UniProtKB/Swiss-Prot annotation:
The keyword Repeat does not apply. The record marks 104 as: Transition state stabilizer. This is Bifunctional polymyxin resistance protein ArnA. It catalyses: UDP-alpha-D-glucuronate + NAD(+) = UDP-beta-L-threo-pentopyranos-4-ulose + CO2 + NADH; UDP-4-amino-4-deoxy-beta-L-arabinose + (6R)-10-formyltetrahydrofolate = UDP-4-deoxy-4-formamido-beta-L-arabinose + (6S)-5,6,7,8-tetrahydrofolate + H(+). The keyword Electron transport does not apply. In the N-terminal section; belongs to the Fmt family. UDP-L-Ara4N formyltransferase subfamily. In the C-terminal section; belongs to the NAD(P)-dependent epimerase/dehydratase family. UDP-glucuronic acid decarboxylase subfamily. UDP-alpha-D-glucuronate binds at residues 395, 400, 434-435, 462, 493, 527-536, 614. Keywords: Antibiotic resistance, Lipid A biosynthesis, Lipid biosynthesis, Lipid metabolism, Lipopolysaccharide biosynthesis, Multifunctional enzyme, NAD, Oxidoreductase, Transferase. Gene3D superfamilies: 3.40.50.12230, NAD(P)-binding Rossmann-like Domain. Bifunctional enzyme that catalyzes the oxidative decarboxylation of UDP-glucuronic acid (UDP-GlcUA) to UDP-4-keto-arabinose (UDP-Ara4O) and the addition of a formyl group to UDP-4-amino-4-deoxy-L-arabinose (UDP-L-Ara4N) to form UDP-L-4-formamido-arabinose (UDP-L-Ara4FN). The modified arabinose is attached to lipid A and is required for resistance to polymyxin and cationic antimicrobial peptides. One of its GO terms (molecular function) is UDP-glucuronate dehydrogenase activity. NCBIfam families: PRK06988.1 (NF005414), PRK08125.1 (NF005998), PRK11908.1 (NF008872).
Length: 662
């Protein structure tokens, strides 16, 4: 019986995959591809032309996961879906359309080099072997079980183009051998080893910048990874751009400074280790393809001249503006960025008690102020800095019902002004969305790109925080379509030292664990709202801040235009369970004798605790596939450890308060 397939394909390897399916006797019901981008150098074969010649129905929708296309694909009743170098992720509903599964051909030996442009990345990293992998598709990109692999040797002279040719040939051989077995159902699957996984994002022309302080071998690998038909490696010669198409490594650099011209015939440049001969290149985007010696003449180079590239002088630190720098996330993040050594932090807040320890750092600049008042300072620093984090917000549930208009004014209106400054000055914004935007979503795991955002009726004012954040998420997304660089991150119940203050808990304006600790410290009953059955996934602040720091670092631009949940799905617990573990650790703490006896648990109704207009959520569990894929991040700290650190901090704070009042 003939197997029916729907194919998603682009590039040479898309053509290779289609030919292999036809040769293996598959019926191709339809092919989905991309319209060629006029800005891209399309050196590869055309899937559209192949399908036209073979009489195969062809489509190029903007969104293949759209319900209209999903229904059309379901009506085709495919046995298999295949993806051959298709550039968009296929969603879970689409993958489920295939009766016998969905399969992807990836251009590396998975689990290594997941993600984009693997052929370029393996060359940049100096690998000696890569290959192709046929694997089952799951929701997470390039992570499904492996069915077949074929290795490809990388020769020292290989470029991205020659390696692509090798991969195309290997793909043809792999599919020739595997597709008949897959149709028979006798091709075994092997789960990927996640401990060996690596992920790489898209490359841009800017990634070709030559840093002469690096070893010549690394620069040679960069040149061959991005040479024609790609944009090329480059550096600056005065005001002119020098694009390097071919190079070779020569031992030694005569002890000269990186970037120094050692000779003009051949054109030889000193590197951090050894030197690089520039064999062929061109001057500027429209220049002629020339030999290195003629390039030296055209550019006016002489022995001893210096070429400019990355890190040609002291590297300027990335300037990060943190508004709300004294808050829980702000102060922990500032500490992490300053420790990294690559950042300069500028911050504003209405207080500074949590950041006193940072003020002595010469790369930390703090101004006490209010974002609603100090608009000139705010606009100037958005213009001055590279990355902006507007962390100022009211984020405690009791305030949503007690001061809903203030929540809207601060969380939406004031932050919208900051976002518009980022648009005006072309600055990247990393915006704190919230797990609250998912509201009463019924999905078992909340997915950034697929889960519905569900809130209650208008008379339940607690949702004003959720919808204020959601509306700003949507505004930022819309600005992103016009060129704003952004990342939205959604924290899921981060906990740790300096989360709140006990004074805040005394007036009810704090997070759950601070409220529970206050009851233990003061010897009052722990109040469990509606019995404390609500479940949350608690995340250690150190885990959360590490993920956020990676978003700010934004390696290879992979976080641009993305939404990222930052939470720990393994640390799910009810509020009652949180209280019970807190009590257990409190009773065992060395400072236990300094505090009153435990007064028990008391169940209270949410209305009596939060007031009218409150509505709770039974569970809130994140999918962290985006964080794993984009950040190579996985939370590691168990809830018990986080509770212990948080409890210890607040018990010592309580004793300091007592001493101050004595």
């Amino acid at each position: 019986m003939t197997s029916k397939a729907v194919v998603f394909a682009y590039h040479d390897i898309g053509c290779t995959g289609i030919e292999a399916l036809l040769n293996a006797g598959y019926e191709i019901a339809a092919v989905f591809t991309h319209a060629d981008d006029p800005r891209e150098n399309t050196f590869y074969a055309s899937v559209a032309r192949l399908c036209a010649e073979r009489g195969i129905p062809l489509h190029a929708p903007e969104d293949v996961n759209h319900p209209l296309w999903l229904e059309r694909i379901r009506q085709l009743r495919p046995d298999f879906l295949f993806s051959f170098y298709y550039r968009r992720l296929l969603g879970a509903e689409l993958l489920a359309c295939a009766a016998r599964g969905a399969y992807n051909l990836h251009g590396s030996l998975l689990p290594r080099y997941r993600g984009r442009a693997p052929a370029n990345w393996v060359l940049v990293n100096g690998e000696t072997q890569t290959g192709v992998t046929l694997h089952r598709m799951i929701e997470r990109a390039d992570a499904g079980p492996i069915l077949a692999q074929q290795a490809v040797a990388i020769d020292p002279e290989d470029t991205a183009l020659s390696l692509h040719g090798k991969l195309r040939k290997a793909a043809g051989a792999l599919l020739r051998d595997s597709l008949p077995l897959l149709a028979l159902g006798v091709l075994p699957e092997v789960e990927q080893d996640e401990s060996q996984a690596s992920h790489f994002g898209r490359r841009t022309p800017a990634d070709g910048l030559l840093d002469w302080h690096r070893p010549a071998r690394q620069l040679y690998d960069l040149v061959r990874a991005v040479t024609q038909p790609y944009p090329g490696a480059f550096c600056q010669v005065g005001e002119q751009k020098l694009i390097v198409w071919s190079a070779e490594v020569v031992a030694g650099n005569h002890g000269r400074e990186p970037g120094s011209v050692l000779s003009c015939d051949p054109l030889r440049i000193a590197c951090g280790e050894d030197s690089l001969v520039l064999r062929f290149g061109q001057r500027g985007e429209r220049g002629l393809y020339l030999a290195g010696t003629q390039l030296a003449t055209e550019l006016g180079l002489v022995e001893g001249a210096r070429l400019r590239g990355a890190a040609s002088g002291p590297q300027r630190r990335t300037r990060v503006l943190i508004l709300g720098v004294n808050g829980f996330i702000g102060n922990h993040l500032s500490e992490r960025l300053l420790r990294d050594g690559r950042y300069e932090v500028h911050g504003m807040d209405i207080g500074s008690d949590a950041i006193e320890r940072l003020k002595a750092d010469p790369h930390f600049h703090f101004v006490e102020g209010d974002i609603g008042i100090h608009s000139e300072w705010l606009e100037y620093h958005v213009k001055k800095c590279d990355v902006v984090l507007p962390l100022v917000a009211i984020a405690t549930p009791i305030e949503y019902t007690r001061n809903p208009l203030r929540v809207f004014e601060l969380d939406f209106e004031e932050n919208l002004r900051i976002v518009r400054y980022c648009v005006k000055y072309g600055k990247r914004v990393v915006f704190p969305s919230t797990s609250e935007v998912y509201g009463m979503c019924q999905d078992p795991d909340f997915d950034e790109d697929r889960s519905n955002l569900v809130v209650g009726p208008i008379n339940k004012q607690r949702w004003i925080y959720s919808v204020s954040k959601q509306l700003l998420d949507r505004v930022i997304w819309a600005y992103g379509q016009q060129g704003l660089r952004f990342t939205l991150f959604r924290p899921f119940n981060w906990m740790g030292p300096r989360l709140d203050r006990l004074d805040s808990a005394r007036i009810g304006s704090s997070r759950a664990i601070t409220q529970l600790i206050l009851h233990l410290v003061e010897g009052t009953p722990i109040r469990l709202v509606d019995g404390g059955a609500q479940k949350r996934c608690f995340t250690d602040v150190d885990d959360g801040i590490e993920a956020l720091a990676r978003i700010i670092d934004n390696r290879d631009g992979r976080c641009d235009g993305q939404i990222v949940n930052i939470g720990n799905p393994d640390n799910e617990a009810s509020i009652r369970q949180l209280g019970e573990e807190l009590l257990r650790q409190f009773e065992a703490h060395p400072l236990r004798a300094q505090f009153p006896p435990f007064a028990g648990f008391r169940e209270v109704e949410s209305r009596s605790f939060y007031g009218d207009g409150y509505q709770d959520v039974a569970h809130r569990k994140p999918s962290i596939d985006n964080a794993r894929r984009l950040l190579d991040w996985q939370p590691t700290i168990e809830l018990r450890e986080t509770i212990g650190k948080t409890l210890d901090f607040f018990l010592h704070e309580a004793l300091r308060e007592r001493e101050a009042q004595a």
